[in-house]
Amino acid sequence: MKRLSVAIADDNDQILEILENLINTDKELHLVGKANNGEEMYEIIKEKEPDIVILDIFMPKLDGLEVMERIKEEKELKKNPNFIVLTAVGQERITQAAFSKGASY
């Protein structure tokens, strides 16, 4: 069975470490990249084309919403990843914005 490729982005190193450990313990997942900001994640997505991207909404350089919007408009990708967004802010407008930009979860 093909493992799902996953990329993760968060500006909090502790969150990145937790996510990396969770992914590495699951035999069906394979970590293909991690980033501390949205600009790095955008480049990882273009290069690696992961199946799943877990990303924070509030990050430096590009926020998670901007990353999703740019990827949605990217013509050279063979496929768009499934986005799972993380945020410490529980505002409904942020959640709605994430789903409108392409978030799956």
Regions found by a protein language model. Name each.
Residues 13-33:
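Two-component/phosphorelay signaling modules centered on CheY-like receiver
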